Amino acid sequence: MHLESNDLAGGLSDERFNFVTSGLADRDISQRFSDKEKSELALYIQQAWENLHQDAQYRQAEILSLTSENFTWGKYPDAEAYARVAQHRQPVTNGKHDTHLYASVNLEDSDDVLATQTILLHLQRPNTILGTAYFPYERGDRPEIHADGSQELILLNTLIMNIQHSGVRGLIHISPHSPAFPWFCLKAGIAPLSLSVIPGLIKEAEKQGFLDDTVITANSDDGAKSSRQFLTNYLECGDSINGTKRKETGKTIVTYTEEDFRKVRNKTVIFTEDIISTGGTMASSIFQLFNQGQAKRIIILATYPIFAGNALERLGLDSRIQIITTDGRTPMADITKSNYVTVIPVKDKIPKVLELDKQGVNFWSQTGKEKLEELGLSIFPW
């Protein structure tokens, strides 16, 4: 999977271009990635993955589950974290840091990252390709400036640098739609592989009979535009709408044009969302598309479920609204009793992707794409 110089877009002409010394590495992270930057980033990701796999020792590496009886972690009653390693589980390296490892893990929060980092340090920092359905704070891409002048700091970058120090050289994860996550990985010297669950979510929608010949795709803000375009192409539907999101006095408002309302009339509208958090964004879209647009049905394909606070009530779910999401994160509300939320498994797909990678599957090849799609996955469409 070598990138020839004529394959490189956006002025990239060197066959072995270096992300760290590129202009893209120095971009202002407070700004959204442009389409051109996303295209360049995708090439850097592919090149980094190729460079990582020039080391043939990964073909003989052990695939280890860090979520098993050999490794446990959690919290003491005082909420402090702990990590334990089974007595018989010895370090996998000889002290020279030249051992290679595939490790699958189910991360939920920063304590899980700390435990993973500590376990890898205990194993004497093997050169690790880590696979996880979720990586904490991976949506933290733009530092927000508040009304009082204070600025949000990005916690994600610190976590990524920490796991790189513990030996992580490659990271396979389910993408939350933010190109900032692989950007931070590349900055830290980690080759990222960002995967999308859209194929699996669509298959579930088809299985449940939610799709028909009057489908139109939608997104509620520019952040999901790339995934909406991927969805449009995947479904081969010719039309889509693009909402504009803004926040006013604590409320999220999504606006659509009269032309958008005309397009959705009597149609099934399919959204792609990174998460369902408080439900504010989707509630605004749902209200308008049903009341002003006269949409027939709304299907929400969400990478992660959160359902914080009264999100379920705010969304006003009924038979016209269906949410399909994954088990990549644990929701804050009990969604098992909802007739309008379907959860598909994705955590169990990560070890299978690691196995394919160990076998030398090129995920950018036609064969690699087909094998990912069999798992309900695809390379994320930046």
Segment roles from a protein language model:
Residues M1-W382:
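PRPP-associated nucleotide enzymes
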